[in-house]
Each structure stands twice: as structure tokens, then as C-alpha cells.
């Protein structure tokens, strides 16, 4: 009987030990998979958009706090770089700001730029390549071509760039101030710090990037979607007449389709034309924009950087165009001046138009 009890005791402890080892191994694997080679444990927005994080973290209020609220304990401490902690400690010692307020500023800038950047809503993103990235190859391709079909596989013409250039990745930035008296008052009275200036700077860089994407920068030799040579140009009809907007978009999509582009198509218009689309279409009971959205399933957007009433229809896809991003927008500390503190919202990007024939402007 004693031997039976001993054997049962051994079996129980063997099973318990096995599961304990399995749990330790699993925890280490989870930690390494979540944070391996990542020095941005507390700054997930540097690489991911809100939509991406929402898809993984459903019904999780992570946005109101740092990411390590959920991904804490074993992994974060090992991967969160000492340099980053030391950098914040230096900033904190100079401006007397706590980490919660610093993260609040960073989150506000990220969410504001994500809300206001129109080009990034339909353009493929190439990157982020890193803060130090200063240039990127720019290949130009011809019209889409059919694949070959035969018995021996000898007649296929490979897709290749017609030419290659080097595109410079430019810094886009706007500075703002936080005043020493405001910071001290916020800390002493335990009131929220006013970050209106940071949000204003975020809106400013968003408009500048969209201006580069749509209008280009002629002084730097950067074409925009509305100015690229080789694009398709069609006449814009009077959209104040109900139905004309829809018909124009149909003709633009027809034009791109006839040249071999299958979509998805996206439409960007000026605010005035966007407002015209929000009227009930004749005897249908539907808004005109509803029919447009069924036609251009890549999205319908308005942009405030359009210099005139114009409509832009493009065939999206990285083969046709993309946005090369060096670094996403974030806040950097400039330094003290006159006892106040200067910050900079900064990022870097450049538009790469690889096939201008995939663009159709109605003007």
C-alpha cells in the first residue's frame, strides 16, 4: 500500500513539473515573439497605425495608456532600451514633465496626423525605412501587359522598370512651444497639460505632406498626383448639376480600365465637389456619392490642399505609386529658450509615382 501511495505521488509531481516547465517555456516564447529586436516597446505607434492595433486589440483601451500596460512583466524590461529611458530622463529633468504627459503629447500627434493625412488613406506605404533614410530608388513602369500562355514557356516578356532614378526623402516638420509657467502650473495644480500647440503642429505637417502628395514640390523636382506628366487629363463638367459628378467618375474609370488598370480605384476631390456629391440622385432616394462609392471601391476622399476644383481618380497599388516613409511623425524636444521649451513634430516621406498613366485628373 505504501508503495502504491509513493507511485501516485511521483506521477502527480511528474505531471506538475512538466506543466510548470511548459509554462515557463511558453512565457519566454511569447515574450520574445512580441518584443524581439524591438526598441519601441512603449511607442507602438511609431510602426503601427491605430487601425492595425485595433484589429489585434479589440475592445482593449490600450490607446489611453502605453502599450506595456498589456505587454508588461517579463519581456518589456529586457527589450526597452536603456538609451530610450535615459533620453526621456534627460528631457524630464530639463522641462519637469512626467512620462504620462509626454506619452499624451506623442499620442495626440499620432492620432491627429492619422486623422488628417488624406494621401496615406489610399496610398501603399513603403517603410518606415528609418530616421536616417535620405533617399530611395524610384522606378518607372509602363502600362500593364498580359501574361503569356503557350506550351513551352518561351514567349513571356518580363516586367521591368523603364528607368530608375533616386528620390530624396525630405523632412517635413513644424515647431511648437510649451511655456514653462504652463508646465509648472499643470504639475502643481494637477491639471491636464494643454497640448493645443502640439495638435496644431500635427495638422500643419499633415497638410504639408498632402500638399507634396497632390500638388508636388516644383522647386525640389517632386511631381504630385495632380501635376505628374503622362497622366490622363479629362474635362470636368458642372457638378452643380445632379448626376454630372457620377458620370465624370464613370468616364475616368472607363479611361483607366481601357488602359489596362483594373483597380481598386480611389477618388479625391476638392471640398466643394465633395459637397456636391451629397445630394439625392434623381428619383432614386440615394445620395449621389453612394453610387460613386460602389464604382470606386478604393474610397472617396476630400482634400483641403487642392488649389482649385478638380477631381482625381487613380488606380491604387504599389506597382503604380506609393509613399516612401523614412519615419512616421513624432515629437522631438528641440531645447530650452528664454526659460520656455521648444518641440518639433517631424517625419520624412516622398511620393513615388511609378506609372503616371494610372492617374486621371478631371479639371
Curated annotation (Swiss-Prot):
InterPro entries the UniProt entry points to: ENCAP, Encapsulin_nc, Multihaem_cyt_sf
This protein's UniProt keywords: Encapsulin nanocompartment, Heme, Iron, Metal-binding, Signal
Residues that bind heme 1: 44, 47-48
One matching Pfam family: Linocin_M18
Protein residues bound to heme 2: 67, 70-71
Cofactor comment text: Binds 2 heme groups per molecule.
Gene Ontology annotations for the cellular component aspect, listed alphabetically: encapsulin nanocompartment
Region described as Encapsulin domain: spans on this chain: 95-363
Family according to the record: Belongs to the encapsulin family. Family 1 subfamily.
Subunit structure: The encapsulin nanocompartment is probably formed by 180 monomers, with the N-terminus (diheme domain) inside. There are 36 pores where the pentamers meet as well as 3-fold axis channels and dimer channels.
Protein name per Swiss-Prot or TrEMBL: Diheme-cytochrome-encapsulin shell fusion protein
Species of the source: Kuenenia stuttgartiensis
Amino acid at each position: 500500500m505504501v508503495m502504491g501511495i509513493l507511485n501516485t505521488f511521483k506521477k502527480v509531481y511528474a505531471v506538475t513539473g512538466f506543466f510548470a516547465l511548459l509554462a515557463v517555456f511558453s512565457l519566454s516564447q511569447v515574450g520574445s515573439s512580441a518584443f524581439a529586436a524591438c526598441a519601441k516597446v512603449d511607442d507602438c505607434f511609431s510602426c503601427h497605425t491605430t487601425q492595425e492595433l485595433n484589429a489585434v486589440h479589440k475592445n482593449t483601451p490600450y490607446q489611453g495608456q502605453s502599450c506595456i500596460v498589456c505587454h508588461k512583466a517579463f519581456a518589456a524590461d529586457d527589450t526597452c532600451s536603456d538609451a530610450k529611458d535615459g533620453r526621456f530622463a534627460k528631457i524630464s529633468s530639463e522641462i519637469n514633465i512626467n512620462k504620462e504627459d509626454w506619452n499624451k503629447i506623442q499620442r495626440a500627434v499620432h492620432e491627429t496626423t492619422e486623422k488628417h493625412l488624406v494621401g496615406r488613406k489610399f496610398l501603399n506605404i513603403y517603410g518606415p525605412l528609418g530616421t536616417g533614410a535620405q533617399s530611395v530608388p524610384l522606378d518607372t513602369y509602363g502600362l500593364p501587359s498580359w501574361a503569356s500562355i503557350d506550351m513551352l514557356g518561351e514567349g513571356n516578356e518580363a516586367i521591368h522598370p523603364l528607368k530608375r532614378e533616386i528620390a530624396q526623402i525630405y523632412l517635413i516638420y513644424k515647431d511648437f512651444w510649451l511655456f514653462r509657467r504652463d508646465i509648472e502650473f499643470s504639475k502643481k495644480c494637477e491639471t491636464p497639460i494643454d497640448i493645443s500647440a502640439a495638435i496644431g503642429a500635427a495638422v500643419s505637417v499633415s497638410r504639408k505632406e498632402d500638399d507634396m502628395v497632390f500638388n508636388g514640390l516644383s522647386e525640389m523636382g517632386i511631381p504630385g498626383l495632380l501635376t505628374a506628366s503622362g497622366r490622363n487629363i479629362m474635362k470636368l463638367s458642372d457638378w452643380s448639376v445632379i448626376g454630372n459628378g457620377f458620370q465624370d467618375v464613370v468616364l475616368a474609370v472607363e479611361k483607366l480600365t481601357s488602359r489596362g488598370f483594373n483597380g481598386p480605384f480611389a477618388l479625391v476631390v476638392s471640398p466643394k465637389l465633395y459637397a456636391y456629391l451629397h445630394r439625392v440622385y434623381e428619383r432614386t432616394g440615394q445620395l449621389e456619392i453612394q453610387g460613386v462609392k460602389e464604382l470606386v471601391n478604393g474610397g472617396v476622399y476630400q482634400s483641403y490642399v487642392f488649389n482649385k476644383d478638380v477631381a482625381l481618380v487613380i488606380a491604387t497599388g504599389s506597382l503604380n505609386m506609393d509613399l516612401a516613409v523614412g519615419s512616421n511623425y513624432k515629437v522631438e524636444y528641440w531645447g530650452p529658450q528664454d526659460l520656455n521649451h521648444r518641440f518639433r513634430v517631424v517625419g520624412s516621406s516622398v511620393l513615388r509615382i511609378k506609372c503616371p498613366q494610372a492617374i486621371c485628373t478631371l479639371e
